[in-house]
From Swiss-Prot:
PANTHER family: PHOSPHATIDYLGLYCEROL--PROLIPOPROTEIN DIACYLGLYCERYL TRANSFERASE, PROLIPOPROTEIN DIACYLGLYCERYL TRANSFERASE. The chain crosses the membrane at residues 9-29, 55-75, 92-112, 117-137, 172-192, 201-221, 228-248. It is found in: Cell inner membrane. The keyword Membrane applies. A 1,2-diacyl-sn-glycero-3-phospho-(1'-sn-glycerol) binds at R138. This is Phosphatidylglycerol--prolipoprotein diacylglyceryl transferase. GO terms for biological process: lipoprotein biosynthetic process. Keywords: Cell inner membrane, Cell membrane, Membrane, Transferase, Transmembrane, Transmembrane helix.
Length: 259
């Protein structure tokens, strides 16, 4: 397969450059907010539209700061500790989903504590929204030619311009499909068909469980970060960080369905 060589920069005006990566965050947040509002309109849970509007600022800060610090601390600390100014260059890419998720969770906790809202009631509404951002983010990774997969002889193999010119799995597209489209469909089905918002923590549990499963599986096709490589001989950082999410998700599902 031929890699569609798309310029990562949409346009630039002097020193200001707008990239597909940055745009994916903006569109993801806007679409997510719109979808969350539709969920609130449909089910009228404890969370109101005003709550969602107030939460946006918390969410944006938590996701961006958490995602960036997660990447800096977990994936490439030596580079950023020697060049701290590079931490601010988010337009170059380099965001950790696990860091962003943790940042978002902390932001949600602080928001709920301030406004006296049930924490899981908020995360249950946010859970069906997150795959939208995951899908757009992975498409942006693909456009950037980063986070590509391992070498393959299959027909899916694609030569990325920033690699060693060997055909590799387009693992960004695998993640966009499973962590984005499939996970979005699962949560939309459970939310609207099975009314899972009625069981506190269930939507959150479904998200964490399926994301963990999908990420652990797709990491088999994804090239480990060169500065880290494999951990414990065969595991990647992404797989290790996804195990707690899988366990947390399973726990929340069980807790939402007490016998």
């Amino acid at each position: 397969m031929t890699f569609p060589n798309i310029n990562p920069i949409i346009f630039s005006i002097g020193p200001l450059a707008i990239s597909w990566y940055s745009l994916s965050y903006v569109i993801g947040i806007l679409l997510g907010w719109f979808y969350a509002n539709k969920i609130v309109e449909k089910f009228k849970p404890q969370i109101t539209k005003k709550n969602l509007e107030d939460f946006i600022t918390y969410a944006v800060i938590g996701i961006i700061v958490g995602g960036r610090l997660g990447f800096v601390l977990l994936y490439n600390p030596s580079r950023y500790f020697s060049n701290p100014i590079d931490i601010l260059k988010t337009y170059e890419g380099g965001m950790s989903f696990h860091g962003g998720a943790l940042g978002g969770i902390i932001a949600a906790y602080l928001f709920c504590r301030k406004y006296k809202i049930n924490f899981l009631s908020l995360t249950d509404i946010i859970a069906p929204v997150v795959p939208i951002g995951l899908f757009l983010g992975r498409i942006a990774n693909f456009i950037n030619g980063e986070l590509y997969g391992r070498i393959t002889n299959s027909s899916f193999g694609m030569i990325f311009p920033n690699s060693d010119l060997m055909p590799r799995h387009p693992s960004q597209l695998y993640e966009a499909f499973f962590e984005g489209l499939v996970l979005f469909s699962i949560l939309a089905y459970t939310t609207f068909k099975h009314k899972t918002l009625k069981k506190c923590g269930l939507n959150s549990g479904i998200f964490f469980t399926f994301y963990g499963l999908f990420r652990i599986t797709i990491e088999i096709f994804r090239e480990p970060d060169i500065q880290i490589g494999f951990i414990l001989d065969s595991l990647t950082m992404g797989q290790i960080l996804s195990v707690p999410m899988l366990l947390l998700g399973s726990y929340l599902i069980c807790q939402s369905n007490p016998k």
